[in-house]
Amino acid sequence: RSYATKISRRFAKDTFSVSAGLSYQDDEVDSGVPGGPALGIQSKRTPELMLGLYRMLDAYSSVSFNLTYGRPKGYLSDPYKQIGATETLFPGDPLLEQDVFYLYPENRPDKRDTFTAYLEGKKYFSELEGSLETSYRFFADNSDLQGHTIELKWLQRVGEKIVLQPLYRFYKQSQADFYNITLDGTGISPSLQPNGNTPYYSADYRLSDLSTSTFGIKITYFKTQDLSFDLSLDRYLVKGRDGVTDQRVYPDAKVMTLGMQWEF
């Protein structure tokens, strides 16, 4: 379940606006997945506070800026993710001693502070019948994870009914302070069940030092004023940057999306 409210005020003949919003998301996470911690249904609650500014620079260009603070709380681990640790059985016994690699559920903090800043600019070029949209997004949380996203998008009208949207997006992030590919050498003794308390640990590659590039194009066909169809093709490339995580865990993807929008 999610709830949201927003207020907005316009100034300078509607060319400048200030907005503020509050949202609350109440989720339930089923931890009883195969290989998961089997803690049953766990709660996850995410309140967010947003402040936004919008400025129309002229008839063809605008800029907007948003700040968002969130504080997720509850079960924040991923029940599908595990981390390994090597343990020695029967140490000192010349016949029975052996190393065994065990898997444990990850253990993330049960509280998180997130900060997001988003800057977007739009410019319409009348002679080309197209517009350029550029944006930059900064994200950070209290586990030292920082992310930077740059996106460029061109919207080109072709005739009266078709719009082409080529896109490029680049994302780069630093790793969370509790990310490790294994627990070997960390001195951490994992618990059998995640509890949200220290020590924290996760081998989820999405928390590692990585970069991604997305190349895409979208074609929208406006059948009528109220009905449109679209086709998107995206190429998604991911690269690990820590020199430790196996590159094979980073997924590349080709994605095709079909859509329809009907307003009534």
Language model regions located:
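Outer-membrane beta-barrel channels and translocator barrels
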Residues: 11-14, 56-60, 126-128, 159-161, ...
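Transmembrane beta-strand segments that form the barrel wall of outer-membrane beta-barrel proteins
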Residues: 1-5, 18-25, 130-140, 235-236
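Solenoidal tandem-repeat scaffolds enriched in leucines and small polar residues
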Residues: 13-90, 94, 106
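General secondary-structure edge motif
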Residues: 33, 45, 101-102, 134, ...
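Outer membrane beta-barrel transmembrane domains
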Residues: 66-122, 140-151, 155, 161-256, ...
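Short, surface-exposed basic-aromatic patches at helix termini and helix-loop junctions that form
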Residues: 6-12, 155-156
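Face-selective signature of the C-terminal outer-membrane beta-barrel domain
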Residues: 61-63, 113-119, 131-135
